């Protein structure tokens, strides 16, 4: 049952093994701590990240934009967190709220909204190739909504990312696995399904596994695993033999 964590560790250290070699991509170099730079407009930064941004602006003889007004700020946070604009009533209430932490209250309320998981869970669902239909020319409806809802609930419940990954890769293999943990493995079942006549079922089964391997590598490592299906990867640190260890 330790295989998900062992696999992730193996790939991580394999990538780190590239450090020190000529032409190593920055993505495989461990991040280092950097002291925030000194800036001229010292009263503008509100946090260390602002100092890095301001330093670049000053080096280009540019100035920060003016602070957004309350309505613009409210619209931005609504669209960012729940994907919907505020209602006229919500705008009116926010403009009337004179508390110094009124914006923070809005952020906390939106983070607690079920819409938050729907808005941000869709990014994972897109990467996991979720769809409500099978694809191909028939594109018949499929019953996968329970996996979709699991992702939304996990996002709203702030499920730790390591557990989020483990339950999708091997939720059915966990000790005393719950129904929800088994549903999470729907991650592997998001492959397109070809129900056309004349389909070679064994070939389709193998193609489905290729799809799962490629997707798992892409969403967890940001690497194009599919290239290693036919040969050692030309750019990313993946050998063909490593690809088929996941197959």
Predicted stretch roles:
Residues 5-15:
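Bacterial N-terminal signal peptides
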Residues 16-20:
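Sec/Tat signal peptide C-region and signal peptidase I cleavage site
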Residues 21-247:
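Short, structured secondary-structure elements
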